[in-house]
């Protein structure tokens, strides 16, 4: 896997993105929330709201399979028909995920050390969306140079359950406070876990 920095996004950056059709170039919705599949560590899709300052929630959702492209400024789909009513797998995940939001969860190492609390989820947009790390704050052991937050890479497989998120203790050496350099940190961390190399 090659991680390019321009393809790394915070999940919160996607909130408010217009959903635009390739068919007519029309912005038909906005991203309301990002639906994160905690068991799969992946982005499953989006809940939506109507466009505009007072736009309320929409009944339709947008599954990732229907997304043609995702950039820093818009979510592109083929046509308005790609939005689905809330009776599919995505809607079920939204229902089940209530009460187990990753944001504000504690991050602990498998050695029992508290690293901080999740403030955002970092997503790699490549062949498919993959959650590759967390932005965390409130750390007493990690001291960022600026902004008070750091980025913690995740292993290739990570099951999330309960109130705390557990990461390998080796993550210490791969934490960064720079999102632009975070992709390289993810690759080095995963290589280290696979091979045990420094």
What is each of the regions a protein language model found here?
Residues 1-198:
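Peripheral interaction segments used for macromolecular assembly
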